[in-house]
Amino acid sequence: MSKYFISAPAKINLFLHIVGKAPCGYHLIESVFAFVELYDVLEFDIGSRNRGIRFLKPSCINRRDNTIQRAIGHLVRRCSPGTTDNVYVKVLKNIPVSSGLAGGSADAAAAINLLSKLWGINEKETERVAFRVGSDVPVCLESKTAFVAGMGDVVELLEDSFLPRHVILVGPKVELSTKSVFDMYNPKAFSPSIGKLPGNSEDWLSLLKEARNDLTEVSVELVPEIRIILDVLGSLDGCCFSRMSGSGAMSFAIFEDENSAELATRYLRRNYPDWFIFKTRIIRSSDQEDNNMGNL
């Protein structure tokens, strides 16, 4: 039996524009995904007597029907009978469930990355499996800052050294179903495409500050506390911009310097003890390259 430990990072949507609807009914997006230092931790026992998923904290997640289980099922079906080992996964969930931070997608991507290597599944099939499991899973395979378009199947990695590092994640302690948000989303008109991506740091920062999350108003209608959180975040000293992530209910504020983020975190924890509040940092591509060099 072999053991593997993998950390799966949360994502935030620096913006999320809904630009249309595909014939199949899925919405078409344009978004920039960034990943932050908030992780689920997964322990994989390969070749165990047992198989299945165990969540180490109390959770509403179905042990028999979840993104990890679906990912494993799709991968097994792409292998010859008898060539795969039992897989038993223990999951320490730190990313809030149904929060707009793609915890389930990150966990599935961790399983896909590991098992596709162990079982010799090629890159093209790996990407197909990721998309079958969920629209956020393809970008989570790399867990690097990326422009994401279409139904989540178009992923373009971005140079991200210009991004401010410091982030505060804030949300009400409630779950908000992505499906319920999209079921209510019925705009008079979709957002226009941003067209050509910015070519320099200043233009990127300008776009990020002026952009939005098109799902915000629907999510606020379902969870009004999101509006209060966004108003509070936008008023914090040193905040570059704040926004809801994904379909909510988690929001974030971006700061240029750590001191401003620390002072804001203390203020929030003192005045809003009932909110989920987590100070973290954006993971830049250079961080991952440095880590990879350290593992050689």
Curated annotation (Swiss-Prot):
One biological process GO term for this chain?
isopentenyl diphosphate biosynthetic process, methylerythritol 4-phosphate pathway
What is the name of this protein?
A: 4-diphosphocytidyl-2-C-methyl-D-erythritol kinase
Q: Which domain of life is it from?
A: Bacteria
Which Gene3D superfamilies does this UniProt record tie to the protein?
3.30.230.10, GHMP kinase, C-terminal domain (3.30.70.890)
| UniProt similarity note | Belongs to the GHMP kinase family. IspE subfamily.
Q: Which organism is it from?
A: Anaplasma phagocytophilum (strain HZ)
Catalyses which reaction? 4-CDP-2-C-methyl-D-erythritol + ATP = 4-CDP-2-C-methyl-D-erythritol 2-phosphate + ADP + H(+)
Q: Which residues form the active site?
A: K11, D136
